Regions:
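Conserved acetyl-CoA-binding loop-helix of GNAT-fold acetyltransferases
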Residues: 75, 81-95, 117-122
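Conserved GNAT acetyl-CoA-binding A-motif
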Residues: 98-108
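A short, well-structured alpha-helix characteristic of acyl/acetyltransferase catalytic modules
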Residues: 1-21
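Acetyl-CoA-dependent GNAT
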Residues: 17-79, 150-151
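Conserved acetyl-CoA-binding loop of GNAT-fold acetyltransferases
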Residues: 121-131
Length: 151
């Protein structure tokens, strides 16, 4: 329930079929993964290369750089505020740079998700602009920050 405060919203009902369809579907030019800590699954992440209309969706210039966007969450509250999220983001940024030639990584957290924003800043991400009414959440469009990490 706590994760749904920022991911999809509390008004979205998931079943095993909808979860499987969403989280196991292949992503073009990207990948999905379960985040583990000490061999226990604690979260989820996905990364995908921006192309075409995704640059427009993020209002981000398509200037020839290889740019990836990421979505992630740690779903177990007992693992929050322990540095695990920022460590994971640093590891993912290194993986994207070293294995996929990424030059930039983008995140788009809800502006009121202060805990996540602190973790992202701790990992080196910078807020570069506001994305007003960027994401549908609990029946209305909410404001997000566009955050960037140059690799």
């Amino acid at each position: 329930k706590r994760v749904l405060e920022y991911y999809e919203g509390r008004d979205v009902r998931f079943t095993m079929d909808t979860l499987s369809a969403h989280f196991l579907e292949e992503i073009p030019d990207g990948f999905r993964m379960i985040i583990e800590y000490k061999k226990s699954p604690i979260g989820y992440a996905q990364a995908y290369q921006l192309s075409g209309e995704l640059f427009d969706e993020y209002d981000y210039p398509d200037d020839g750089h290889i740019v990836f966007a990421m979505d992630q969450f740690i779903g177990e509250p007992k693992y929050w505020s322990k540095g695990i999220g920022s460590s994971f983001l640093k590891m993912m940024a290194s993986h994207l740079k070293d294995n996929m030639a990424a030059e930039r990584v983008l995140l788009d957290p809800h502006q009121d998700n202060k805990r996540a924003i602190r973790a992202y800043e701790k990992a080196g991400f910078k807020i570069i602009k506001s994305l007003p009414k960027h994401e549908m959440f609990e029946g209305e469009k909410v404001d997000c920050w566009l955050m960037e990490l140059a690799l």
